[in-house]
Amino acid sequence: MESMGRQDRRLHQQLKESSSRFQTLMKRLIAKYNQPFEDDPLVEMRTLTYETPQGLRVWGGKLMKKEDKEYTQVIDRLNGQAPEGDSESSGADTSLEENWPSCSSAMREASGDPRQRQPAVPGNTLETDLRRKYLTQVDILPQDEEYFKNAEKRGGKDTVMTWVPSVTSSVTPASGCQDAISAKSSGGPEVSALSSRGQGPSYPCPADMAIVARSDGLSLLGTSSNSVSSQSFEVDDLCNVTISDLYEGMMHSMSRLLRSKPSCIISTKTYINQSWKLRRRPSRKQGLHKNRTHCPRSKPSQRSARKGPASCSEPGKEAGILRDYGNLLHVAPHKTGLELKSVSLEGSKRQVHKSSPAWKELQMMPQKDLDLNRERENRVMTLQWLISPVKVVPRPRMLPSQVEKWYREIKIKFDKLHQEYCLSSGKQPRLTDPTESWAVDVYRSGSKSPGSRQDVETCRPSSPFGREKTERPGEALEDLRGNGKSVKTKSCLLRSCPSPEGSPSRSPSHSQLSSGLQEHNSEPTGKAVWPSTAISAPSIGSPGCGKDNYYELKKEFNRLYQKYCLSPQRAKVTSCGRVSPMKAAAALPCQSEHLKRLNPDSPQQSSQKRSISPGCHRRVLQDSTAQTASTLVRDSWLPTKRCKLSYPVACAHQAKFHDTSGASGWP
């Protein structure tokens, strides 16, 4: 116990020394900076006045002229100086009674003076108004936070105060004696005084008096356990105050002092907490939230009573779903697979609102809570995006109007190219013909994955642009599997017919495409037949070999589809091998004769007429063996892989087309 008491005394002594050092430093700082900086005015805190070239001016008030003797006397009295005529004839007590009648009566009442029942003499009204307007209670700074809480609860009502002599000259008087005053003598009972409202006009207090709340557990500095009015303050009691005891009251008083200037308000802790509230942000999309129900603001007690974690969680989720569903209007339909219409969306919302039982609870839920939850989610997502090392930037979404405009432009360009292609080849454009070009069907078949089943079915349209039913090339390619069956490949690739063997009018792109179909297998089998012909030849090889040939054909077909149809930007390529087959064939005399034989009106006749040349046809009829058919396919149908020097006419024609009109790929 003795050791504990010794430690407490040592700690108490150290605290006193620390407090004394702090006060010494503070006094030095005050003495150092208690002067104007450069041209700044020096404001007297007791009178809130400062000197100007025009005269004496009150802080936040009007100018006090030098000729005005009445104002000058008021300022002299506030500074503790008596007027020149009264300084010699009157003493301290007389001046106190004349200038501060209410304060002197309160002191006589506290000391038991028989003159306490004498009526108070009205003082100067100008002096009272000046103090009431421009002075603040700086002497209540040492009080604890309970004093300010009680002051806020009172709301300006009369409070019980105690008169004590001022400790230092820097303590500023209070705003007056308009409050009720009670005094406590050193040995007598407590005596109460009437309110100043019943006595008449209130009078300010002198500069050497301070007001503190009457409490036995509080001292002027907040740490003394004895009564304030029963003891005189000693130097040791001054060492107990700390800056934490003074800070909150100091900020409160300075805020009240500088409240006339909005830019000079000093924010306290309470003010900061009240100001930092989440404010509602205006919605960017005003047209999409017309169905929201806004509830009127209620009192804080009612709003807190309505908040229920269990009842408000589900409606909040549904509200988020509704908002997200409404925000899907700007997403393109081909990306989401949903056809969102404005009329159907409004109708579905009405049905959801009528059928959902939680919608009634959602209507009663304040809109502010929904916005707070949404804002909190957005902040969490933003924080996660900032923390994550990989920044995934979302692509800008295209509005439905932009998508439709994009498709419309592509369609116009494609139709224009198709018309030019048909006119250059001497044909009329027929977009409804089932035997139209393979590129037209691919364009109308919609966006499919390159490796899917729909990719092979290029002649079967799957989008609303065209609904024609044609044979699938995949079904024709499946006939390669069986032995003894005829290989009948019907496609919409090209309407040109190849020339007989040895003819120099074969298109280079014709040979390039055929070589691409045969570049992975060099066996003497009839695995690759030009799609624009219809010949009958028995298949040679085992079923497994036919299956392998089928998959190789399918792979090459997909590669050509990706190369020429999925990239419309490559329509004009300056390559010699990518000249349009129809343009090249239209320029050649041999091909023009075959084009005259074709009839685009009847697909069956055109498919029958699009056969090989007479010489080749007689050769196929005469040779019925598999070796002859394979030799026919290998020798007369499929040319070499590259355009060699043995075809000077075709290469020269390609160079001519490249120089005049530019080489263009397939549409």
Swiss-Prot record:
Gene3D superfamilies: 6.10.250.2320. The modification Phosphoserine is found at S169, S185, S195, S388, S424, S449, S462, S567, S613. Residues 279-297 have a biased composition (Basic residues). Residues 601-611 have a biased composition (Polar residues). There is a cross-link at K554 (Glycyl lysine isopeptide (Lys-Gly) (interchain with G-Cter in SUMO2)). It is found in: Nucleus, Nucleolus; Chromosome, Centromere. Residues 496-515 have a biased composition (Low complexity). It holds the Pfam family Scm3. GO terms for molecular function: DNA binding; histone binding. Keywords: Cell cycle, Centromere, Chaperone, Chromosome, DNA-binding, Isopeptide bond, Nucleus, Phosphoprotein, Ubl conjugation. Residues 466-482 have a biased composition (Basic and acidic residues). Residues 78-126, 181-201, 279-317, 443-530, 596-617 are annotated as: Disordered. Signal peptide: none annotated. GO terms for cellular component: chromosome, centromeric region; kinetochore; nucleolus. GO terms for biological process: CENP-A containing chromatin assembly; chromosome segregation. Centromeric protein that plays a central role in the incorporation and maintenance of histone H3-like variant CENPA at centromeres. Acts as a specific chaperone for CENPA and is required for the incorporation of newly synthesized CENPA molecules into nucleosomes at replicated centromeres. Prevents CENPA-H4 tetramerization and prevents premature DNA binding by the CENPA-H4 tetramer. Directly binds Holliday junctions. Interacts with CENPA (via CATD domain); the interaction is direct and specific for CENPA since it does not interact with H3.1- or H3.3-containing nucleosomes. Heterotrimer composed of HJURP, CENPA and histone H4, where HJURP interacts with the dimer formed by CENPA and histone H4 and prevents tetramerization of CENPA and H4. Identified in a centromere complex containing histones H2A, H2B and H4, and at least CENPA, CENPB, CENPC, CENPT, CENPN, HJURP, SUPT16H, SSRP1 and RSF1. Interacts with 14-3-3 family members in a phosphorylation-dependent manner. Interacts with MSH5 and NBN. This is Holliday junction recognition protein. It comes from Mus musculus (Mouse). The lineage of its organism: Eukaryota, Metazoa, Chordata, Craniata, Vertebrata. The gene is Hjurp.
